[in-house]
């Protein structure tokens, strides 16, 4: 389960970087991560490994999923990084830095945001 989540969530991001395909496995990775958490697999792992189960939550463009991610990452070294992601999702409902790759039109506010430091990951 952990290995499959890593392959779907992390490998696809790196193998297909700068293409829409980089995000194509996100729904499946999130579904597997949700199931792993439901079954308590994350609680049986060291936090350094459990973090990889939680990463699909961080990569999601859903406000609801980020509410869950905030709780999952609480107390972990990745917590502040999750909060940085959540702020963007709360503000825009998506990651503006993905717009061009995914063929989405950016709003004027998103375009302004993209000129700011740390607007992308």
Give residue ranges: language-model regions.
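Intrinsically disordered, low-complexity activation-like regions
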Residues: 1-18, 23-121
